[in-house]
Design a protein with these regions (language model features):
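Glycine/tyrosine- and acidic-biased, solvent-exposed loop/turn segments at the edges of beta-strands
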Residues: 16-336
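Sec-dependent N-terminal signal peptides
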Residues: 4-13
């Protein structure tokens, strides 16, 4: 009987030693090492470290083996609810890791493999509503990721490869209707991109090349009328841009752009298609004579420009070609 009692006491002693609890303040590391010791001791720590709030409540418990995190590490809120729950093996994050809101709801959960995220990560709102689903492989986002709205409907989805967007990325309106779709290649926008009205009708379409706009961007009214054509090169408007009347769909204005600035002849049109006015631009400023026309094609007026300012004599004509008004300007100001 005495031998049995002695054996039990020895086992109890060993277990107590292996699970000794030491205050966080007594722990230390030496030099550049991450190995944890009890201050003044030379043997790496094995046991449980406790960290407490100023009021004495437990803030964290950390399991160590041979000076490295090994087993559960749990942190707490002041109210006693768990804040995070992680698992380590020999100092490396392994297995399921969870973080919680103060009300006890899961904030996110993810699986680690050799310190890297690996598998499906889910995040939630404080009420428990699913917010995101992201797949990881060897620490990088891989495959289809999804974002959800507070009402549970899908807000967006994207494919990833080696941590970068690859393929079609989609966004949705709160009613579930597709809002946009963009193609990606090696993490950069590449190929067709489209934006839709909440009705599902096409609003805009453009083309990207290696992350920058390249090609004609077209914008539409909700009833399908083309209202704008912008030629892009290297993410800047370059070439002949056209603007159309939203009611009739007819050409209203056209101008040439060079690196986002108007350069060259710009023209405006009547709804009938007849020329209304024309003027040259230089570095986005009017330069030369602006000519305005009656719908029958006869000259209605002339306005001289210099460096974007009216400079010279403004002339207005009647439909018979007679000058009916002249006003002199100098550097944008009328000369009296």
């Amino acid at each position: 009987m005495k031998k049995i009692l002695l054996s039990l006491l020895l086992i109890s002693s060993v277990l107590s030693f292996g699970a000794q609890r030491v205050p966080y303040e007594k722990m230390t590391t030496y030099g550049n090492s991450n190995i944890v010791y009890i201050e003044g001791q030379e043997t790496p720590f094995t046991g449980i470290v406790e960290k407490k709030f100023p009021n004495g409540k437990i803030e964290a418990t950390m399991n160590f083996k041979d000076g490295k995190l090994h087993g559960k590490t749990i942190t707490y809120y002041q109210n006693g609810n768990i804040k995070s729950d992680e698992n380590f093996i020999n100092g490396i994050a392994q297995g399921v890791s969870k973080r919680f809101y103060e009300n006890g709801q899961v904030e996110y959960e993810v699986t680690y493999k050799n310190q890297k995220r690996d598998g499906l990560e889910r995040s939630y709102s404080p009420t428990g509503q699913l917010q995101t689903e992201i797949i990881y492989k060897d620490g990088k986002i891989e495959g289809l990721s999804k974002i959800y709205r507070a009402n549970g409907k899908l807000e967006g989805e994207a494919y990833f490869k080696d941590g970068q967007p690859e393929g079609i990325t989609k966004e949705y309106y709160p009613n579930g209707i597709l809002r946009s779709e963009v193609n990606y290649l090696l993490g950069a926008k590449h190929g067709a991109s489209k934006i839709y009205y909440e009705s599902g009708k096409l609003q805009s379409e453009a083309t990207f090349k290696n992350g920058v706009l390249d090609g004609i961007q077209k914008d539409y009214t909700e009833d399908g009328k083309l209202i704008r054509e912008l030629p892009f090169k290297y993410n800047q408007v370059n070439g002949l841009a056209k603007f159309y009347n939203e009611q009739t769909g007819k050409l209203e204005y056209e101008t040439i752009y060079v690196d986002n600035m108007r350069e060259g002849l710009s023209k405006k049109y009547y709804l009938s298609g007849k020329l209304l006015s024309e003027v040259n631009f230089k570095k986005d400023k009017e330069e030369g004579i602006l000519k305005a026309y009656y719908e029958n094609g006869k000259t209605q007026g002339e306005i001289p420009y210099k460096n974007g300012l009216i400079h010279g004599t403004i002339k207005r004509y009647d439909e018979n070609g007679k000058v009916v008004e002249e006003v002199k300007y100098k550097e944008g100001k009328e000369v009296k």
